[in-house]
Amino acid sequence: EWVPSNFTRLGGFFNGLLEKKKIVYAEIVFDSAFYYDVSGIYPEATAFALTGEHTKYLTALLNSQLLTFIFRAFYAGGDLRGDTFRYKKVFLQNLPVVRPNGVVALALEALVDHIQTAKLKDQKLQSTYFEQLIDGLVYEFYFPDEIKTAGKEILPHLGELKPITDDMSEAEKLAVIQREFDRLYDP
């Protein structure tokens, strides 16, 4: 019999995990690809999940160029075959994650929603731009003095991003994304 005898008992250990708010990621990747999930997706292939507090904020940080660079340079142990690298839990735990600051965290969380909705609707220009904003905000959050001295602050110019909510229709979500993109991309 190929099914382990303790399968039901082990299944109880994971009971409810996939229905929680979580970050889903693959272990071997070409680039960071952390997905914030609230819909209870069940991955069809090997994937890992992070749960806990501030998962949406953490999604933004983990997908940023800065933390991806730090992970690849100091924790990934070099590239695997084909330019891929491995996100191992033991090394992810060592990343220098800064505790969320209220204003920055809200902006990053709103941008995660904007990016994920834009990607689902194939809005590549908007999602790429919002990803660049996250990268800039993460640099600003980790290196505030250097960014301020260089006169490259983003947060003071960002304003309050209109949130995307579950009760919005798809058309309303896309309209919010387009308005925010238009407002920020070419002010």
Per-region residue spans from a language model:
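Non-catalytic DNA-recognition/assembly elements of restriction-modification systems
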Residues: 98-187
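Polybasic, glycine- and aromatic-enriched phosphate-binding surface used to engage nucleic acids
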Residues: 1-106
